[in-house]
Amino acid sequence: MITSVYAKIEYVTNTKMLFVANNWGYWVNVKPNSGFSRTDNNVLVFLHELTFLAQNNAINKELYAFKSLKEKEWFKALLTINGIGPKTAMNVMVNKQEEVLTLIKNNDLNGLLRLENINKKVATMLLASDIASKHYLKNQIVVSDKVEPQIDDDEKIDDSKDLNDDELLSEIVIEAIDCLISLGYKQEQIKTALAEIDLKNESINDSADLVAVIIKQIGLRTSEVS
């Protein structure tokens, strides 16, 4: 699971971007006016992966790219709001995070409606949430953007430089649980399945792998009961 890379931007539009890192090309989603440019070389890109179930029951993944960790955490926080998906979250992020949070905290509907890309439906969902007061917003989103040390273009990107194995595994589990809940699985089902799975299994490399294993385990338990 890649959380950040140093990359060369090859192509960027208002919603999509192609970048190259370690001779691999990545086609990712970006917010409007993302701040990325084709002139960017060896720029740090923060990534968030979303896993979803396609119509043919295949598990698909999409990558979302951000200029800072603060942006990435803001995106993840917006996705916790009922009714807000990745496209809407990206559109909300065109506006300054602090301004959006202040308007939500003040219950200012008219103020939200004056912002770009926020209609009455989205504004109502924002106001109905408790996003402005959640603990993780204070501790994760409102952080200073620090300058990261530059590395050579040909240096191999390895997530283990920043996260140890247990931290990576914890993030994989959290993302897998979020995905399964969004697919309609109950927390008790997920918890029971997790207790029966060897999380150190080499076949589990990312959240998509874990989602597939948990779904299979839930299916086995269901067939045993029936």
UniProtKB/Swiss-Prot annotation:
Which keywords fit this entry according to its UniProt record?
Cytoplasm, DNA damage, DNA recombination, DNA repair, DNA-binding
User: Region Flexible linker: what ranges?
Assistant: 146-167
Keyword DNA damage recorded: yes
| Residues passing through the membrane, by range | none
Show the GO cellular component annotation of the record.
cytoplasm; Holliday junction helicase complex; Holliday junction resolvase complex
| Compartments in which it is found | Cytoplasm
Q: Cite the residue spans of the region called Domain I.
A: 1-67
Q: CDD domains of this UniProt entry? A: UBA_RuvA_C
Report the record's Gene Ontology biological process terms.
DNA recombination; DNA repair
> Which parts of the sequence are annotated with region: Domain II?
68-145
Q: Name one GO molecular function term.
A: ATP binding
Q: How does it assemble?
A: Homotetramer. Forms an RuvA(8)-RuvB(12)-Holliday junction (HJ) complex. HJ DNA is sandwiched between 2 RuvA tetramers; dsDNA enters through RuvA and exits via RuvB. An RuvB hexamer assembles on each DNA strand where it exits the tetramer. Each RuvB hexamer is contacted by two RuvA subunits (via domain III) on 2 adjacent RuvB subunits; this complex drives branch migration. In the full resolvosome a probable DNA-RuvA(4)-RuvB(12)-RuvC(2) complex forms which resolves the HJ.
**Physiological role:** The RuvA-RuvB-RuvC complex processes Holliday junction (HJ) DNA during genetic recombination and DNA repair, while the RuvA-RuvB complex plays an important role in the rescue of blocked DNA replication forks via replication fork reversal (RFR). RuvA specifically binds to HJ cruciform DNA, conferring on it an open structure. The RuvB hexamer acts as an ATP-dependent pump, pulling dsDNA into and through the RuvAB complex. HJ branch migration allows RuvC to scan DNA until it finds its consensus sequence, where it cleaves and resolves the cruciform DNA.
Describe the family membership recorded for this protein in Swiss-Prot or TrEMBL.
Answer: Belongs to the RuvA family.
| Comment block on domains | Has three domains with a flexible linker between the domains II and III and assumes an 'L' shape. Domain III is highly mobile and contacts RuvB.
The name of this protein is Holliday junction branch migration complex subunit RuvA
